[in-house]
Regions:
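Long, highly charged, low-complexity intrinsically disordered interaction regions
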Residues: 2-5, 64-81, 91, 417-515, ...
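Short, ordered loop/turn segments at secondary-structure junctions
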Residues: 39-41, 130, 239, 321, ...
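Structured, non-catalytic alpha/beta "coupling" segments that mediate domain-domain communication
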Residues: 75, 89, 99-103, 226-239, ...
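A glycine-rich phosphate-binding loop feature that marks nucleotide/adenosyl-phosphate handling sites
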Residues: 179-187, 319-323, 377-382, 401-408, ...
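Single-stranded RNA-binding regions, centering on S1/OB-family and related RNA-binding modules
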Residues: 542-711
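Duplex nucleic acid-engaging cores and interfaces of nucleic-acid transaction enzymes
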Residues: 51-54, 61, 65-318, 324-422, ...
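Short flexible coil/turn linkers enriched for glycine and charged/polar residues
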Residues: 16-17, 29-30, 96-97, 122, ...
Length: 711
């Protein structure tokens, strides 16, 4: 069975069977995807996280299919209907749809019209009709009039019910319909009478009809959401006449009276059984495809957001802006610890701008503030303007930071545990400041679904979504690595091989014993075994460790290689890291071994060049157009700076400094054809856009990047 799985996955993914086998062996041995991708390149042939995850997903699906086959075989055997040919066919089938078609005639059913007819003894009559040789079926039917069968017509009706069920369970018939649905099925949506006003936001779909195979995922999910809310009635249908004709060609072999009875049964089978069944199947398949696309977009957006550039360890002031309630101000040290908080009221209706400036000046001096993070919610632009009009004694950079999800964090158990004496406004301002310092460390504390970069996220398969987002967070955290001595338990949870319990044990050990001085010391943490250490060690950094390799992505299992390199050059490891000329003398091929190949050696040399390097780029200061405050200030043709706030499969939304985000449709991202917006833009990217259209009533803004100078 294992080899069959390897062959099938290799064929699907275009990856060699050897790579599949080695990867599955590592996964089954408890290795994580980030660990395999980073430290087992020789075994996998250099597969990345996406490929390894795909192997894992297909393997899990095949295992599920294997379990389903076992259930089907057992059920048919219990009925005493299993034959060697049938069992062989089930065992050789791995397509879920085909498997269910094979099983359908044997599947236990609630009482059907066909079953009721069989109990009346009408199956022999159905067989006579299907042979289509009897010239007078009514006369033959008269012989079945007894008991609950009232007359010949009643007998024929029961026989047709049996035939209809046989037609609906026929594999060839089902495949005929599937092929027709696949080619020509049309998705139709119509508004439910009386729901026009309530469902106004769905008015684009009130009377729409389009090819199912061409319907984009965002449209399909919007239509399905409206259907769930009772606003739309939705159907999927091919050409009914063509479908019936195809079925009749298969089952009706005579123009006589029996043939007409069979034709009537075929029409009933299509309308009552087959069409609803295949429609349900296609509805589920199209929904699954749309879910997968939406989840892919969400995961990519989340990845870009988590890997946004950090300001780093600077002393930051966080401001959660507001009008009537004032602006909540917090001051943090370079490690993100809260030092001070208070309110200022620079805006209407209070208008205490002088007092606000004096307070800010005092805080900036007292806490040696180096940067200010302003939340991008209510009063954000006004607060930014107020700050930029002031002259502080210290040079401070001003940044606008997304507040999305900050309110969720501020009311969370994590925030309450850290700041039990402070209210949600203080916690929210702290989150804004920390997002500027290190977006990854801060955002992992928030449910990804609350961050606001998804597309119909509440409508997709929630277990699939959670799995994908959790894996995305894990990949990002391990790509960057974390400081073992400052990382929160929540951040450590996502490190390869740890999880919640070991993460908390590390934090507890740190609290009791002080900072870790080496990676080896991890083995003293309760419940830290050799396997967990192997999986996590390379992703944990100790900046001031005695061994400089403890602050790199070089795995402890490879320290001996670096030590040998240093020894061969007559220097220490620290000197090797510090001296580029020494590193240039290294001949990597000298250190090849049966377990260490060039991929690992190249990674080691890259780490020695930039120890503990952060893959995230440097942060950039950004300013919105000062003349644009509301949607009413926009004019067609106006060019504006903006920040990409969300990406969907139909385009990108851009924050241009007002309440409403504008949309750059896929066709307006570039002169060339673009199939995926991620080819052109990324989350939080700074862009210049031109206004194409403004709908003030519907609060919609159309943007373009074509013909606009790139930032």
């Amino acid at each position: 069975m294992t080899q069959i799985f390897h062959n099938m996955i290799a064929a699907i993914l275009g990856i060699s069977e050897k790579q599949i086998g080695q990867t599955l062996s590592l996964l089954n041995d408890g290795a994580t995807i980030p660990f395999i991708s980073r430290y087992r390149k020789e075994m996998t042939g250099g597969l990345d996280e996406v490929q390894i995850e795909a192997i894992q997903t297909h393997y899990e699906k095949l295992n599920e299919t294997a379990k389903r086959k076992e259930t089907i075989i057992n059920t048919i055997q219990e009925q005493g209907k299993m034959t060697p040919e049938l069992q062989k066919r089930i065992e050789e089938t791995w397509d879920g749809t085909v498997l269910e078609d094979i099983y359908l005639p044997y599947k236990p059913k609630r009482k059907t019209r066909a079953e009721a007819a069989r109990q009346k003894g009408l199956e022999p009559l159905a067989t006579i009709l299907m042979l289509q040789r009897e010239p007078h079926p009514e006369q033959r039917a008269a012989g079945f009039v007894k008991g609950d069968v009232k007359d010949a017509d009643d007998a024929l009706k029961g026989a047709r019910d049996i035939i209809a069920e046989q037609v609906s369970e026929n594999e060839r018939a089902r495949n005929t319909l599937r092929n027709t649905f696949a080619r020509q099925a049309v998705l139709t949506a119509k508004v439910v009478k009386g729901k026009e006003e309530e469902g106004a936001k769905y008015r684009d779909y009130f009377d729409c009809s389009e090819s199912l195979k061409r319907c984009s995922s965002h449209r399909l999910l919007a239509i399905r959401r409206a259907e769930t809310e009772g606003v739309l009635k939705v159907s999927i249908s091919p050409n009914d006449e063509e479908c019936v004709e195809r079925l009749e060609r298969q089952f009706v072999r005579s123009n006589n009276a029996c043939g007409k009875q069979v034709a009537e049964a075929v029409q009933d089978a299509y309308k009552r059984l087959l069409k609803p069944s295949i429609e349900t199947e296609f509805a589920a398949q199209s929904k699954e495809r749309a879910d997968d696309e939406a989840i892919r977009v969400f995961a990519e957006n989340l990845r870009q957001l988590l890997l946004a550039s950090p300001l780093g360890q600077k002393r930051v002031m966080g401001i959660d802006p507001g009008f009537r309630t004032g602006c909540k101000v917090v001051c943090l040290d370079a490690q993100g610890n809260l030092l001070h908080n208070e309110n200022i009221y620079p805006h209407p209706p209070v208008n205490q701008s002088k007092e606000a400036f004096a307070k800010l000046q005092k805080m900036i001096e007292a806490y040696k503030i180096e940067a200010i993070a302003i939340g991008n919610g209510t009063a954000s632009r006004e607060t930014e303007d107020f700050l930029k009009r002031q002259t502080f004694n210290r040079e401070v950079q001003i940044f606008i930071v997304s507040e999305q999800g900050a309110s969720i964090y501020s009311a969370s158990k994590i925030a309450r545990d850290e700041f039990p004496e402070y209210d949600v406004t203080v916690r929210g301002a702290v989150s804004i400041a920390r997002r500027l310092m290190d977006p990854l460390a801060e955002l992992v504390q928030i449910d990804p679904k609350s961050i606001g970069v998804g597309q119909y996220q509440h409508d997709v398969d929630q277990s699939k979504l959670k799995k994908s987002l959790d894996q995305t967070v894990e990949n990002c955290v391990n790509l960057v690595g974390v400081n073992l001595n400052t990382a929160s338990s929540h951040l450590l949870t996502y490190i390869s091989g740890l999880g919640p319990q070991l993460a908390q044990n590390i934090v507890n050990y740190r609290a009791e014993n002080g900072a870790f001085s080496s990676r080896k010391e991890l083995m003293k943490v309760p419940r830290m075994g050799a396997k967990a250490f192997e999986q996590c060690a390379g992703f944990l950094r100790i900046p001031d460790a005695k061994n400089p390799l403890d602050n790199t992505a070089v795995h402890p299992e490879s320290y001996h290689i670096v030590e040998q390199m240093a020894k061969d050059l007559g220097c220490s490891v620290a000197e090797l890291i510090a001296d580029k000329e020494l590193r240039l003398k290294i001949q990597p091929e000298r250190y090849l071994s049966p377990t260490v190949g060039m991929p690992t050696l190249k990674d080691i040399l890259q780490e020695l060049e930039k120890p503990g390097r952060d893959p995230r780029g440097p942060i950039k200061v950004f300013e919105f157009d000062k003349n644009v405050r509301t949607i009413d200030d926009l004019r067609i043709g106006m060019e504006l700076p903006g920040i990409v706030s969300n990406i969907t499969n139909f385009g990108a939304f851009v924050d241009i400094g007002i309440k409403e985000n504008g949309l750059i449709h896929l066709s307006q991202l570039a002169q060339k054809y673009v199939s995926d917006p991620n080819e052109i833009v990324s989350i939080h990217q700074q862009v210049r856009v031109k206004i194409l259209g403004v709908d003030t009533e519907r609060k919609r803004i159309q943007l373009t990047m074509i013909g606009v100078e790139r930032i």
